[in-house]
């Protein structure tokens, strides 16, 4: 349900004091229009008093709640912006991650979050629509840092965030302070993971990335990953989490394992979308791990994944080749 507590209009500074322009009747009339949009609970904030609440009661007291018939869509949201996953390919920026980056890891351990903000700005300017936030470092309080990082970045960056940790308590710490609907990264098909992560997703609301692996590891076959994905979607439903709030990661493995493994992941993308009707995501840069020409390999594999029906990818949006692939794909697939 949506709750609103608006001010009595925008204040004007008169004789050094804020004066709110709306009278109780005007205020109630404005709030009534919001109720017509589907708001369930109403109240008043700055500039209101009991007369305003009485006017609300008089106008809305006998009104029945107008339930909205909302379409089921996959979306992530900040307090200021919503990203829908049925409107073109979506880019999730991966650069706020200290893995393999000593300078960033040192900053996080020292409580300096400015480099995270700088990375957030850089990625947004490069075209990222969602930012992955991973703050795991050795010998640090990851839960506290995640909460502080989420609050800090959200205070200045308008796009949604993806909370990334293998520790469910860290995910909860981030979700608790998040304004909007985040993406939780991630849950997998093991019983213990689902028992820990799904309650967090249900309690705070959000999308969740489901890794297509379980107690048996990563299946070498697309069909095996489909069954794990099916288990994740089915179990999520028992927690009240709809499939529209699930993105399945079909798990990219290094090309060093062979071209067959790379193709099997793409097959899994198509299969899972067709059979389960859920959105799919990949961490593209895993394909080039341990290889020389990483940028070209990442870009080519991203293009192949898009052709297989991939909905979004976790990538470095500042990489020129990645930006070009995404731009050309969205241009050619546009219905405008």
Task: Place the predicted regions along the sequence by residue.
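Domain-level signal for soluble alpha/beta catalytic cores
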Residues: 1-247, 253-336
């Amino acid at each position: 349900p949506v709750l609103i507590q608006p001010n009595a209009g925008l204040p004007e500074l008169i004789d050094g004091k804020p004066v709110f322009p709306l009278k109780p009747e005007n205020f109630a009339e404005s709030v009534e229009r919001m109720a017509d949009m589907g708001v369930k609970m109403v109240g008043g904030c700055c500039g209101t008093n009991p007369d305003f609440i009485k006017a609300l009661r008089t106008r809305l007291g006998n009104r029945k709640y107008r339930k909205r018939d909302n379409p089921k869509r996959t979306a992530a949201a900040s307090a200021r912006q919503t990203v829908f996953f049925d409107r073109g390919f979506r880019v999730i920026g991966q650069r706020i991650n200290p893995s393999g980056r000593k300078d960033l890891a040192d900053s996080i351990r020292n409580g300096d979050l400015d480099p995270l903000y700088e990375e957030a700005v850089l990625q947004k300017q490069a075209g990222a629509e969602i930012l992955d936030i991973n703050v795991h470092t050795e010998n640090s309080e990851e839960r506290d840092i995640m909460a502080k990082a989420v609050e800090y970045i959200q205070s200045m960056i308008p796009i949604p965030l993806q909370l990334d940790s293998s520790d469910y308590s860290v995910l909860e710490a981030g979700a608790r302070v998040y304004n909007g609907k985040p993406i939780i990264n991630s849950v997998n098909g093991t019983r213990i993971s689902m028992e820990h992560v799904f309650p967090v997703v249900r309690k705070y609301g959000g999308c969740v990335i489901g890794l297509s692996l379980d107690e048996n590891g990563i299946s070498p076959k697309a069909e095996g990953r489909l069954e794990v994905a099916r288990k994740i979607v089915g179990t999520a439903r028992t927690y009240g989490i709809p499939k529209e709030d699930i993105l399945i990661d079909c798990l990219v493995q290094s090309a060093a394992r062979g071209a067959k493994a790379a193709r099997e992941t793409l097959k899994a993308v198509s299969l899972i979308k067709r059979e389960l009707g859920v959105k799919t995501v990949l961490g593209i840069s895993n394909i080039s791990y341990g290889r020389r020409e990483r940028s070209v390999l990442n870009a080519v594999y991203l293009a192949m994944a898009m052709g297989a029906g991939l909905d979004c990818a976790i990538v470095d949006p500042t990489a020129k080749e990645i930006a070009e692939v995404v731009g050309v794909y969205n241009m050619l697939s546009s219905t405008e």
